Amino acid sequence: PRAMGMLDEPSISRQWVARRLQRALSIERWCGSLREGFARKPDRLGQILRTHSCNAESRALSLESMIRATGSEPYGSWGLGFKSAARLGGSILAHLSLRLKYETAELVAKHTLSEYVSLVAFLEDAPGIDRALPDAIEPMQVQTLYELEELNKIKLEI
């Protein structure tokens, strides 16, 4: 028999799941605003990043619902000023250099994907969690992987 760990207790496990979902939500909000700023420059990459920003907002809304389903309430670590600052930063980067905009967008996509990979791995082992939750997260992970692959195709053009 294996020793029981702290996360084997279902109530603690649910709290950790809510925190991991909140972390993914914060990343989506921040990265979505940054991508929205990148999209202010009307080039092909900007159009793609506008779509990625809309996808991030959609995923964020889903994550909020999932957080509520775990019995928690999503907290706002991003206000209007925060979103505006991220958008402005993205807009400034977008106008400085196409390569810099691309490299930053790629880092954001990799970071977002890694968060979903970690979240899915964590959820698979978490006791007391509805097994439908990892299944609901997986399409988000696939979508972020597709976004990264889409950026990698553009890399060949730059």
Where are these regions (language model features)?
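Carboxylate-rich helix-loop segments that flank metal/cofactor sites and access channels
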Residues: 1-5, 65-100, 107
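Conserved alpha-helical segments that form or flank metal/cofactor-binding pockets of metalloenzymes
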Residues: 43-81, 151-154
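Transmembrane helix-bundle signature of multi-pass membrane transporters/permeases
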Residues: 52-55, 109, 139-140
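Acidic/histidine-rich alpha-helical segments that form the ligand environment
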Residues: 17-39, 84-138
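Terminal targeting/low-complexity segments that flank the catalytic cores of oxidoreductases
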Residues: 1-21, 158
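A structural signal for well-ordered alpha-helices, especially hydrophobic packing surfaces
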Residues: 32, 60, 64-67, 89, ...
